[in-house]
Amino acid sequence: MNSLEQAEDLKAFERRLTEYVSCLQPATGRWRMILIVVSVCTATGAWNWLIDPDTQKVSFFSSLWNHPFFTISCVTLIGLFFAGIHKRVVAPSIIAARCRTVLAEYNMSCDDTGKLILKPRPHIQ
């Protein structure tokens, strides 16, 4: 394979990688917004739950029953983590990190957007 064919292959690989990473960005942004909203709701509900004077006087489950906003947002947050939201909000960086691991064997790397970085060849003496 001559160097022109290699360059074309590298360009095609780079185009595909940047296309894939950029395709993940809108979904990642939506998942981040969902995580932020649910986290803020949980924090607000927790604050209201903790400052309520009746919280110390009743049982734990009665206290949760009296604060449905906190209970629902907390259950939603836990459900989102079980569904893997913590992986979905960082999906492009996971892909880039895995590509860096593979590309390191070929003296290459890539940035977080998928652009290839060619490293100089090591000199053998």
From Swiss-Prot:
Bilayer topology annotation: Multi-pass membrane protein
Location in the cell: Nucleus membrane; Cytoplasm
Biological process annotations from GO: lipid metabolic process; positive regulation of triglyceride biosynthetic process
InterPro entries: NEP1-R1
Pfam families (alphabetical): Tmemb_18A
Keyword Chaperone among record annotations: no
Alphabetic keyword roster: Cytoplasm, Lipid metabolism, Membrane, Nucleus, Transmembrane, Transmembrane helix
TM regions (residue ranges): 33-53, 65-85
Signal peptide span: none
Family: Belongs to the CNEP1R1 family.
Function comment: May form with the serine/threonine protein phosphatase ctdnep1 an active complex dephosphorylating and activating lipins. Lipins are phosphatidate phosphatases that catalyze the conversion of phosphatidic acid to diacylglycerol and control the metabolism of fatty acids at different levels. May indirectly modulate the lipid composition of nuclear and/or endoplasmic reticulum membranes and be required for proper nuclear membrane morphology and/or dynamics. May also indirectly regulate the production of lipid droplets and triacylglycerol.
Protein name: Nuclear envelope phosphatase-regulatory subunit 1
Organism from which the protein derives: Danio rerio (Zebrafish)
Gene label: cnep1r1
